[in-house]
Amino acid sequence: MADCSALESLIEMGFSPSRAEKALSATGNQGIEPAMDWLVEHEDDPDIKEPSVVIPEDSGTDTTDTTDTQAMDTSAERLPLTEEEKEKQTKRMMELIAQKQKEREEREKRERIEQEKQRRKHGQELSAIKQRMQEQEMQKAAEDRRREKQEERLARERVREKIARDKADRARKFGGAGSEPISPPAETSVPATAPSPSSPVQEPPTKKEYDQCRIQVRLLDGSALSQTFRAREQLAAVRLYVELNWPGGPPEPFSLLTSFPRRVFTEEDMEKPLQELGLVPTAVLIVAKK
């Protein structure tokens, strides 16, 4: 089978397809140059696919006319090319080959340039699409961050409002206990007894009354809060004080206890005065997780 590129080149030079195929076939498909040499050498050969001239028979033609016709055909035949003519023909064909090669290279160059333009254009379009997607993602991320910050701010406000409400409720509930007037301790009346002449008079010891007490509360992190309370204030007032003054607020529900003697105060104890719980005049309370 003839080489397609060589066949097309020969056809572009002006050779008929049949002669080009015959030249390539005769030279064993070794390329365009051997085929061109063959075409130059066989330029006078009739084309294998060109119809031969058929002279119609005419019974009225005599021998003399036939002889004249053959002589004319013989004289019309072209003489073989000389070496100089062959060189010129080869040179012309080589120039045609060079021209066709140059045209083909220029065409391929234009095609490569166009392909490069299309590639760059496609790359620019992809870059633009990628940039738009990145900008959209960044914008969405910024909107998400703004929304999260807004939600966090609202959540903090709700927590602060709840803490404020709880503090106010506890202050209303337990704050009145400390406003009770402190009545002086009742004097215990000792019945007068006649002194015995045989024994000295002994007065019973009087129990000292305290109207205030100093409470120290140790928090979970080891820090401490100290405050003075009225002896008749309820233990709930101490718990409220701890909740209000705990740095950052208490992390979780807690209970109060004493280490010696060990005692964990219950919710019922919160309603009892400090004096009744034995926390007067001073006491150390420890915060423990519930």
Curated annotation (Swiss-Prot):
Q: Which residues form a coiled coil?
A: 81-171
Record's keyword terms, sorted: Coiled coil, Cytoplasm
| Name of the protein this chain belongs to | UBX domain-containing protein 1-B
Q: Which terms in the Gene Ontology molecular function aspect does this entry carry?
A: K48-linked polyubiquitin modification-dependent protein binding
Report biased composition (Basic and acidic residues) as residue ranges. Answer: 80-117, 132-172
Cited CDD domains = UBA_UBXN1, UBX_UBXN1
| Xref: PANTHER family | UBX DOMAIN-CONTAINING PROTEIN 1
Gene Ontology BP annotations: negative regulation of proteasomal ubiquitin-dependent protein catabolic process; negative regulation of protein K48-linked deubiquitination; negative regulation of protein ubiquitination
Per the entry, what this protein does is: Component of a complex required to couple deglycosylation and proteasome-mediated degradation of misfolded proteins in the endoplasmic reticulum that are retrotranslocated in the cytosol. Involved in ubiquitin-proteasome systems.
Q: Which PROSITE patterns match?
A: UBA, UBX
